[in-house]
Amino acid sequence: MLQRKSSSNVASDSERRSVFNETSFILLVLATIANGLASDFFVWSKDAGNFPLSPLVVFTLFVFVYLHQKNQNHTAALGIPIAVLALFMMIPSSLASWIGLLLASLLYRIQTDRFHQSLILLIMLALTFIWQNSIFKVVSGFILHAETWLIGAFLAPFYPEMTVYTNHLLFHNGHDLSINVGCSVFSNCSFVLLGWVSMYFLLGNRSLPIKWLAILFILLTLTNVVRIGVMAIDYPTYVFVHEGLGADIYNTILILLSVTPLLFSFCKKEKKACD
């Protein structure tokens, strides 16, 4: 009888420790993300930039916490990933925070020997900010030139007198467009893909559908081409699409694309009902 009680107490203590470790991991993840966004919030507070927190990032964090608590591991120790998060969250650097988040996620995978959906979201989130804030800025010259050429190829039938020069679209009426980082689909797509995968996992799916992600990227590319084509009409139209109501419509379209997994879920339910 005493042996059973002792075993039960040991199991209970082990479970409490694991819950504490998992909770600490989640809190440190959120603190590291806050540190990664701190500089952007500082710039925004000085009225020198846009609000730095995308609704899709907020949604991803919600899904991460929900899935992680649902699938948390009650056996493995998490000392190393927790220590990495605690270290990197104290470094006053946005890039360091995202690198720390990526390292901690990979170490979590190694220590627990599990690769569940919440961890995929965490890795995608870290890579999204590392890509946007660092890697894309380094390689943007080549990417923007190639993307401008592609946009020019699509728009050529509608603007026969248009000329493509590096990352510029030159029109005969003097209304020229420069395709910069903010206009690139490679900059805008990362958050949409993140939101799409978050919704996909929230609906109970487990594996990443590479085919659908590729289709989504193609849709984002075509949407961006149409947007730039409309901006090329004249300057007032450019202002409307780039800064006015047109910008809000475009952002709404991006959010709607990110929640398209709901359509898959609805179609599956309809199919089951018919069967």
Which residues does each PLM region occupy?
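Hydrophobic N-terminal alpha-helices or hydrophobic patches in metabolic proteins across all domains
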Residues: 2-275
